[in-house]
Structure formats: structure tokens, C-alpha cells
Amino acid sequence: MKALFFILASVLFLKTESVSEIYSLAAPACDIYDLNFKKCSSGDGEACYLAALILNNRSCTRKNDDLALEFFEKSCSLGYAKGCIFMGRAYSLTSLDEKHAKIKTYYERACELDAKFCDDYGLLYFYGEGAKKDELTAKKYFKKSCDVGNPAGCGHFATSLNKEDKDINEVTKFYEIGCSGEHYPSCYAYGLLLWAKVDKNEGKNFCKKACDRGNVKEACKWVLDMSKEEKEQILYLRRYLKLGCEDGDTQMCKDLEKIKRW
């Protein structure tokens, strides 16, 4: 049981792309590059961001990763939060010595510009990456993000409350907000909490939702482990292996091919 409550406390902090669930990174049409370039040159940060997305789109003839990075940087410097987040993510993929300091700088700026992004900034404090580990500070930023409508922020705030053994009604309120906003790791964490403390069937249903709709691999594995019916076990085994295979696990790909013959 102690291990279960550790999972409840940490499950939401799986390193998911929480911001991409709020703001789509899909590129605009390739043929509007010139228009956005012109607006960007006039100081429009959003236009710089859109131009960067086009330059970053491999299906566009103008694709130029180096120039795209310049435009993302410019969009951030002009006060467009998405550009700052993109720059932070770009640094997260490097092994540069200044990696964590850069990520913190860009995420902090994004949080200042758009409170929805304070969730990502809070995660830096939760993990202690680029910032001294401080769960109280993380909790503050999660709440700030939640207050302006970021479901991920609400889910992370709920987990912070749960770790502090706050009233379960308060915890579930914020999990519900996160889950209803389609932040599916929130559904998983909510399901585990319900399963442990309230109603096992209802809890399992929320874990299923996290797997079925949100492709949360850990939720699929949990449902698989808790299932007693063979038909359900096979269904969730397939989903779990498929997600693992998509993550690059070659053994899970091989196992998936085996069960396709069942």
C-alpha cells in the first residue's frame, strides 16, 4: 500500500508534453510564410513564431532548421510565450553545459508572458532541474497555471495537495478539472486515488479512460495488471505493447507481433 501512495504522489509528474496539449505546434500552411515574415520584421512575435513553424516543417520547401531557431528566439524576445517554450524545449534536447540554466530562463519568461505555461516552469522546481528542488514553489506555479485554465496545472496541483495529505474532496476537485480538460495523466492519478480510497470500480474506469483516450502507457499497464477477464487482459496487453513499441522498445514490438496472432 505504501508503494501505491508513492505512485499517487508521483504519477502526474511523468515527463509529458503538457503544453502541447494546450497549444498545438502544428505548422500553418507553407504558402503564408512571406506574410508572416513581413509581419515578423515589423515586430509581431506571433508572426515570427508562425514563420518558424513553417521553416521547421519538413513538408515545406523553405525548411531551414537554423533559421527556424532564429525566428523562435525572436518571437520570444518580442514577448510571444510559445516561442520561449519552444526555445526551452530546444535546449532540453542538447547536452550543453548551460542547458538547464537556459531552459529555466525561457520557461520563466514564458510563465511571465502567459500563466498557462507556469505549469512547465513549476515542473522545473518539482524535478530540481535548473532550479533548486522546491515542491512548495512548484505547487504555487501549478496553481497559477490552473487558475487560468491549464488542465495539466490543475492535475499537478492536485498531486501536490495529495502529497500533503490535504482533504480528499479538495484533491479530487482539481483532479476532476484536469481530467475533464483532457489532461489524461490527471485521469490516471485520479483513478488511482479513487481506487485506493473511494471506489475501486470508478477508479478503474478513470484509469481506463487515461489509457483508452490519452494513451497513457502506465495506465494501460495498470489496467492490464488489475484485469481479471481474459478478453480485457488481451485488449490492454495489446494497447500497452503498442504504446511501448511506439516509444522505441524493440522487445515490446516483438511481443506485439506475437500476440497479433492470438
What are these regions (language model features)?
Residues M1-E21:
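Classical Sec-dependent N-terminal signal peptides that target proteins to the secretory pathway
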Residues E17-L53:
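N-terminal leader/linker segments that initiate helical-solenoid repeat arrays
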Residues S42-G45, N57-S59, S77-A81, L93-T94, ...:
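Short helix-capping/linker turns of helical repeat alpha-solenoids
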Residues L50-N57, I85-L93, D120-Y127, H156-E164, ...:
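Hydrophobic face of amphipathic alpha-helices that form TPR/SEL1-like repeat modules
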Residues W222, E232-W262:
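Terminal, low-structured helical/coil segments at or just beyond the last alpha-helical repeat
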